[in-house]
Amino acid sequence: MNLENVTYKDTTPFVPPITGGKVIKVYDGDTLTLATTLPFEGSPMYRFSVRTKGIDCPEMKTKNANEKHCAKLARDMIKSKCLNKIVELRNVELEKYGRILADIYVDGVDVKTFLLDANLAVAYDGGTKVTPEDWLVYYNLKNA
């Protein structure tokens, strides 16, 4: 196959061959940015936005005050656990919108467990989202 004849259906999405890196930014509870190199000699230091596989957190960009409050709690929890730390990525793939999706481990612990245990995330498999009617009520079930 040459480039002149290639079509979209002849290609596969590129999944960066990354297995970990240093967390340099936390956007929200389930999205962070890593600094890492690719596995070839002389690779520059790249940054990748990575979404945590298997969960959905409250959204930062919402008009709902309770959801935004819980989104900030989730973000701050992940910042405290992960920011400026080296993390390991497992099961790296692309999700339906082309973003990197992975299981993210810090100090041997899957970071999604912190959020699920605190009711700051719900399980999510990429299909239809089922989220709490009120994130703050859901959070307070375990944290009141």
Regions found by a protein language model. Give the residues of each.
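Small beta-barrel nucleic-acid-binding modules, primarily SNase/OB-fold domains
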Residues: 1-144
